[in-house]
From Swiss-Prot:
Family: Belongs to the TRAFAC class translation factor GTPase superfamily. Bms1-like GTPase family. TSR1 subfamily.
Lineage: Eukaryota, Metazoa, Chordata, Craniata, Vertebrata
Residue ranges with Basic residues bias: 13-24
Record flagged with keyword Nucleotide-binding: no
Subcellular location: Nucleus, Nucleolus
GO cellular component terms attached to this protein's record: nucleolus; preribosome, small subunit precursor
Annotated segments matching region Disordered: 1-67
Superkingdom, taxonomy of origin: Eukaryota
Protein name per its UniProtKB record: Pre-rRNA-processing protein TSR1 homolog
Organism this protein belongs to: Pongo abelii
Pfam families: AARP2CN, RIBIOP_C, Tsr1_G-like
UniProt gene name: TSR1
Amino acid sequence: MAAHRPGTLKQQNKAHKGGRHRGRGSAQRDGKGRLALKTLSKKVRKELSRVDQRHRASQLRKQKKEAVLAEKRQLGGKDGPPHQVLVVPLHSRISLPEAMQLLQDRDTGTVHLNELGNTQSFMLLCPRLKHRWFFTSARPGDLHIVLDMAKVADTILFLLDPLEGWDSTGDYCLSCLFAQGLPTYTLAVQGISGLPLKKQIDARKKLSKAVEKRFPHDKLLLLDTQQEAGMLLRQLANQKQQHLAFRDRRAYLFARAVDFVASEENNLVGTLKISGYVRGQTLNVNRLLHIVGHGDFQMKQIDAPGDPFPLNPRGIKPQKDPDMAMEICATDTVDDMEEGLKVLMKADPDRQESLQAEVIPDPMEGEQTWPTEEELSEAKDFLKESSKVVKKVPKGTSSYQAEWILDGGSQSGGEGDEYEYDDMEHEDFMEEESQDESSEEEEEEYETMTIGESVHDDLYDKKIDEEAEAKMLEKYKQERLEEMFPDEVDTPRDVAARIRFQKYRGLKSFRTSPWDPKENLPQDYARIFQFQNFTNTRKSIFKEVEEKEVEGAEVGCYVTLHVSEVPVSVVECFRQGTPLIAFSLLPHEQKMSVLNMVVRRDPGNTEPVKAKEELIFHCGFRRFRASPLFSQHTAADKHKLQRFLTADMALVATVYAPITFPPASVLLFKQKSNGMHSLIATGHLMSVDPDRMVIKRVVLSGHPLKMFTKMAVVRYMFFNREDVLWFKPVELRTKWGRRGHIKEPLGTHGHMKCSFNGKLKSQDTVLMNLYKRVFPKWTYDPYVPEPVPWLKSEISSTVPQGGME
């Protein structure tokens, strides 16, 4: 009898799983004291219904709208400072006096003329619009005046030409202003009514299309008639303001009147009285004051004279004669400052910030073993006394000629000459080659010259500086060599490599190998200040500025600042027409430290810029001269030095300079031989960090002489046996990606046996990387000479391809 077998449709009962339904005690034991996340109720989580969400959104919109309206009412109103407008013509055909005359509308309000040197300025009071404007002007070629006045202007009014918009000078001015940071701006066209009616529409269309590249989605206004000027004033009054971060957290002031009281001891130094309206933040007398272009100073007291331009003057009846609506302010500035004088605040010596910018180093407490300048000078004198060496020279050689004969025992120079020493052989070769080429070219020009030469060529040649052209050609060649063979140097034959590169070290990995940022610091690091945590200090200072109530002059007050120990040259510059602008410094901003700035090469400039070359910096509200180091902008703890400012990537410029809290814009200029400042790079301030390590790399190269399976004999990297043994622990690499080490030296001429992780090719090159930390030079100079008005150069700075080979 067959056994019964279950079919496929037999019922399968679910197995009992005892671990699923646990009791409370077992769950607590398994949780080991951990508590589950409690779900919040709808009321506790403050979840709003759809109606409440709409109501809340409408309230937020209303608050933002009220904040914008309050800002508009305060700027130019009776309780705020005048609305400062900077008028900048962007083309040489624009008539600036005509535009300023149109803005002085007699029907709109009262006009107070104020002549500040060469700059035209006036105050316009309009009780009907409840607004007052302060108009100033600047030519686009006057670089310092435009940039300084744009720092404090509430609105910039750009005047455009109806046919071209702006010329080369105006385009250069716009590039600088965009890099520094633009406040609120308005575009106006002057002269379009002078065109025929048929061409006016076409001109406006072409101009709008051309302006879209710089100012997308911006409306063009007209400025040819009095009615159009009135519409422009309404636009300026109702326009939403754009803020600049670096000035909103500081108190600043544009000087309307200046007086100087010489000191009894020294006539060249005295007390400077600056009168103007406080802007930005509350001005405290115990803070330091930075006068743009002149330095940092202390304040004695702040006076509060009466407002010379009230929006609604009391006790003055309106004039019946409409011609009397224009009132010319011809009173003395000193009388304005002393009228209705009231002392607002005096400096407290216990709370006033010090002008100390550097730490006075104590040589007895330093832990660094770096030699001082006196020890270096003594060592040089000792070497000079003991450097009498007997040399074999040809017969008839004088002692002076014998000094030029190279000897194998000469040592390398100091650290400051390492850039020159690294590329000495390349430079000597290039100089000889350039001299030979220049002499051949001169002979060829002399042989082929004819009497019928063009006069235009002679005039063109007179503008060319041959020495400057030769230096520029040499720089182009060095930059080209650096691009083709980055960081490669030739091992000197007259100096032992272990002596020449004694300050360098090898690293197994540039990214992960440790490097102590506090070792072998230079003597200049004893003079600077460093924060324990720069980010936290910056946040706490900004929070104090925004939340804490500061005692002093409120925003919108007309005040007179008594600034002590000011040189008389500041007043002379003001009387010559240079605007005087003062910024209140935040704590620690007068102290020296190491600033790191992220910069990118300006596309309009192609001249090579070498590291440690003197440049002019516009950093926030400061400008100064310094010699920066360029390094790669990476997230690692070590950053490779770049010998040139490259155009294809952003780099970090490192300099010694006074502390500035970011955000702050950075502009780099280079002064030409004719005194003109050329824009090199633009960027922003990244950090104030002396511990940021800039590492210089040198690459020694060798040639494989004999190749085996994984072994090779390499020559030309070193030239004696001792150097091979000295650099034996350093890892080797090749351009084709092989890795290896030195096994042993062969002979006494620098040949060495090396092992690699693969077979070498005959066309491969063996390389050795050596690293050394470098520091910027202390070349900080707060004095920057006034630039010559900018003009586009007629001579192209490009180098022909034949000269680069």
